[in-house]
A protein has these predicted regions:
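N-terminal "arm"/small-domain region of PLP-dependent enzymes with the aminotransferase-like
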Residues: 1-27, 193-195, 199-200
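Active-site PLP attachment segment
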Residues: 68-150
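Conserved PLP-binding catalytic core of the aspartate aminotransferase-like
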Residues: 163-197, 213-219
Length: 234
């Protein structure tokens, strides 16, 4: 249930994204130099498809830098993208001028993508001068992230509410569930004890109270049996 803030939401193995990562490294393309001749990078195309609109992207090595860059351009229209989050529909996520997303690539914890509405930027391209601390990704990592986003687009068409609510009889005693995301009902002062209790039950939840746990896709309902039979009191 700890899925690295959504980076491992498609699984910890990485699948075809890690295969491409390995293949590019094997070809010796290990630097951050330009390895493809195209007006728009494949990663930018993938992000635009995911968000259903043309986007200009920048990468950052911290959540803080990405958020500050978004706010410097669009202080009232910067938001966070989480797949399968009902909040996306409420705020019409595809109309947000600046969106921050974490690519669904496990073990890449220090990469954050800021996706800016292309039309809004073209209206005033000088806005980009306000961006600070953007980084250039090594090509192999960029390829892997591109594949992970396409894998997410595919998964968005396959995973539905029915894949998560089957665990509600156990989980909703301790969390409020929004899609696959679990926000703790357990008071913050009791959260560390609760996390340790879950470990005793063979379950790894988010160690950070402010970072939601995530319902594991396709998990056997039996994995929560120990928690069901040994409830945590708070």
């Amino acid at each position: 249930m700890y899925q690295e803030a959504g980076r491992a939401i498609l699984g910890w193995e990485g699948g075809s994204a890690f295969t491409l990562f390995k293949n590019v490294l094997s070809r010796g393309q290990t630097g951050s130099f330009i390895c493809e001749e195209a007006p728009v990078s494949r990663l930018q195309k993938a992000v635009s498809e995911l968000l259903a609109g043309d986007r200009i992207i920048f990468c950052f090595s911290s959540h803080k830098d990405a958020f500050e860059a978004g706010l410097s351009l669009f202080p009232d229209e910067t938001s966070f993208y989480r797949p399968w989050n009902a909040q996306n529909e409420k705020i019409k996520i595809n109309r947000q001028a600046a969106l921050i997303l974490t690519p669904p690539l496990p073990w890449a914890e220090n990469i954050f993508i800021l996706a800016l509405d292309t039309k809004r930027i073209e209206e005033n391209p000088d806005k980009l001068l306000f961006i600070r601390n953007a980084i250039k990704l090594p090509f192999a990592l960029e390829v892997a992230m591109t594949r992970s986003i396409y894998n997410l687009i595919k998964a968005l068409q396959e995973r539905q509410e029915k894949d998560w609510f089957i665990y509600d009889p156990v989980l909703t005693k301790y969390w409020n569930r929004e899609g696959p995301y679990l926000f703790p009902k357990v008071p913050k002062d009791n959260y560390t004890d609760f996390a340790l209790h879950c470990l005793d039950c063979g379950i790894v939840i988010s160690p950070d109270y402010n970072q939601p746990s995530i319902v594991p896709f396709g998990a056997d309902r039996g994995v929560f049996t120990k928690l069901k039979n040994s409830p945590f009191e708070y």
